[in-house]
């Protein structure tokens, strides 16, 4: 087979250009990424050796070998893992299908330090090697395959694939280093980077180097060169070590390697269980949200091992989806090594591990919540996701309610439900909340005025998830939740009914509102729960449906709503006496537009609003 030339997909070209010219704030991470890829290849081979009958007799000792040539300025990373065939090379090193490149490019912020930290999270770590290499040669042979292949590229838009000779399965990557990055072809540089990022990769990493010694003295001194190969990492599964052997620094360094994240985690939970079930878990709560946290196809951050043998990192059932930001490891002593994904989903052992793990993680989040300042660091990125648990995790619902924080009418900061309940007024029977599209509009809602008169606080819920989960939350600590916009809640305020004589007094004016706004509203009502506002657009049934549709990602169709009027307001009292139909119509539309502004924060037809306003002002002056 002669050399076949291929062109990188457009997005990969963009990525390579960024790698070469922009994302150079922390170049050494290229080695972390290549070692991590090698470790993944060894994990996959280990799993196949346990589950594939054809590979059960394979005699191999999994390891990673690093070597360099300082004269030629090359660095080589070699593993004896699963290897790749020609299709794998094209798919993984040339196209966007498995690279996550598109997501990476869309997440870039322009901050070189932050952007370089994203590399590993998006599965584009291989390309980071072009930060230091002017040319890369990959030689690889897939396990149980007779043919090996070479992949060559200088990162300038094209790559070549050809057949080559390679005895053992696995992958060997040789980097031809740029002059300014030739220091990576040195024993001490490689040793330092591996110890910093890959100390607890669960496979031995060997470094081959030439050791130079001098014997004799003066003219008789001789230089003796000896090639040596030394293991430079602990190769121990950190989660299997005793807590007493580990320092905070060890946990944090392992996280940065494991999660491909340069930032430190907020917290970690290391737990070993012995008894009827034996397993170890190590979970991390990150300080930043994963890029795909709100995507349907998010990647699980938890790896499952059985007796230190990697099983999967693609099972979203290991933890509930509302904890999808958690990274870590579950290592079971009791699961069968050849467990399939279908068996995993029905396995009682794993179900018990999952249940206990959730409780451990929630307890750690509760511990974080004791310190308001630190809890803000957790709640800002992960609070919305945590709320999702109210919808499906009934077992931990009470615990989740304790952990949630809300804005309210009376407080300028996020508060807990416990704080809200501690400030309940003597006759207050419920916890009131108001749903809306954003916090500013909620704070301006005329509905809040009557609650304020009673001294009742109202929770202001503007997250999209709120409309989905809150109607299903019946109570907290025996106190019911109620939507502040619902008629039942307004009755609890003890408001007086609108008397018949008042309705008769406003009958003609209400008819004028209905005639002018017949294409906009479904009706007009007099309301006793408005204080300073003249009018309010309200329709609790349609509002609930709209909130649900937004949460489900559907567009909300325009629907006619009820316009509520405040019969005690001076403006309406004066409109009762207005005999100029043209002027009355302008006032009616202005009041309706004002109510729309309070509801939406914007008007569909701002031009007409402005014309009506100018007309009224002109007559008033």
UniProtKB/Swiss-Prot annotation:
**Subunit-structure text:** Homodimer.
Relate the protein's function as given in its record. Molecular chaperone. Has ATPase activity.
CDD domains attached to this UniProt entry: HATPase_Hsp90-like
The GO biological-process annotations, alphabetized, read as: DNA damage response; protein folding; response to heat
Q: Name the source organism.
A: Helicobacter pylori (strain ATCC 700392 / 26695)
Identify the gene encoding this protein: htpG
Q: Which residue intervals make up region (C)?
A: 548-621
Query: Where on the tree of life does the source sit, at the highest rank?
Result: Bacteria
Record protein name field: Chaperone protein HtpG
């Amino acid at each position: 087979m002669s050399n076949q030339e291929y062109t990188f997909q457009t997005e990969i070209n963009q990525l390579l250009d960024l790698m070469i010219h922009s994302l150079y704030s922390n170049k050494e991470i290229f080695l972390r990424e290549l070692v991590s890829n090698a470790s993944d290849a060894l994990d996959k081979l280990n799993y196949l050796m346990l589950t594939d009958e054809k590979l059960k007799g394979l005699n191999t000792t999994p390891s990673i070998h690093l070597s360099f040539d300082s004269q030629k300025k090359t660095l080589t990373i070699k593993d004896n893992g699963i290897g790749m065939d020609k299709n794998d090379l094209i798919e993984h090193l040339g196209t966007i299908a498995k690279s996550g490149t598109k997501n990476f490019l869309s997440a870039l912020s322009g901050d070189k330090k932050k952007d370089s930290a994203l590399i590993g999270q998006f599965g584009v770590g291989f390309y980071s090697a072009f930060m230091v290499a002017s040319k890369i040669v990959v030689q690889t042979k897939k396990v149980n395959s007779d043919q090996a292949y070479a992949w060559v590229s200088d990162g300038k838009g094209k790559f070549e694939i050809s057949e080559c000779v390679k005895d053992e399965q696995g992958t060997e990557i040789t980097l031809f280093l740029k002059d300014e990055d030739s220091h990576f072809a040195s024993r001490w540089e490689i040793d330092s980077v591996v110890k910093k990022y890959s100390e607890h990769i669960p496979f031995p990493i060997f470094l081959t180097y030439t050791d130079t010694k001098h014997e004799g003295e003066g003219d008789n001194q001789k230089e003796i060169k000896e090639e040596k190969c030394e293991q430079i990492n602990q190769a121990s599964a950190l989660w299997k070590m005793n807590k007493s052997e580990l320092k905070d620094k060890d946990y944090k360094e392992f996280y940065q390697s494991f999660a491909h994240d340069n930032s430190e985690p907020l917290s970690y939970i290391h737990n070993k269980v012995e008894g009827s079930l034996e397993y170890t878990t190590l979970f991390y709560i990150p300080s930043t949200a994963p890029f795909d946290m709100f995507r349907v196809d998010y990647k699980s951050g938890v790896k499952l091992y059985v007796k230190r043998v990697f099983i999967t990192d693609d099972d979203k059932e290991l933890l509930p989806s509302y904890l999808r930001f958690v990274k870590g490891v579950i290592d079971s002593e009791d699961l069968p090594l050849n467990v399939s994904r279908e068996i995993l989903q029905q396995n009682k052992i794993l179900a018990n591990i999952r249940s206990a793990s959730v409780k451990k993680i929630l307890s750690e989040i509760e511990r974080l919540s004791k310190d308001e300042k630190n809890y803000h660091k957790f709640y800002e990125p992960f609070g919305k996701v945590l709320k999702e648990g109210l919808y499906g995790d009934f077992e931990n619902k009470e615990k989740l309610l304790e952990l949630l924080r809300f804005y309210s009418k009376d407080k300028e900061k996020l508060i807990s439900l416990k704080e809200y309940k501690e400030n309940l007024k003597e006759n207050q029977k419920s916890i009131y909340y108001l749903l809306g599209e954003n916090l500013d509009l909620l704070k301006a809602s005329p509905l809040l005025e009557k609650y304020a008169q009673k001294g009742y606080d109202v929770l202001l819920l503007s997250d999209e998830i709120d409309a989905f989960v809150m109607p299903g939350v019946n109570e907290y600590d025996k106190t019911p939740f109620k939507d502040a916009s619902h008629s039942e809640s307004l009755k609890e305020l003890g408001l007086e009914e609108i008397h018949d004589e008042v309705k008769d007094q406003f009958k003609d004016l209400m008819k004028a509102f209905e005639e002018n706004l017949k294409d906009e509203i479904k009706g007009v009502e007099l309301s006793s729960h408005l204080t300073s506002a003249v009018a309010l657009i309200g329709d609790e049934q349609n509002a609930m449906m709209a909130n649900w549709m937004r949460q489900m990602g559907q567009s909300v169709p325009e629907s006619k709503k009820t316009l509520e009027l405040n019969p005690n307001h001076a403006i309406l009292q004066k409109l009762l006496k207005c005999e100029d139909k043209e002027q009355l119509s302008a006032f009616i539309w202005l009041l309706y537009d004002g109510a729309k502004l309070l509801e939406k924060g914007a008007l569909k037809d701002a031009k007409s609003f402005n014309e009506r306003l100018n007309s009224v002002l002109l007559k008033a002056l």
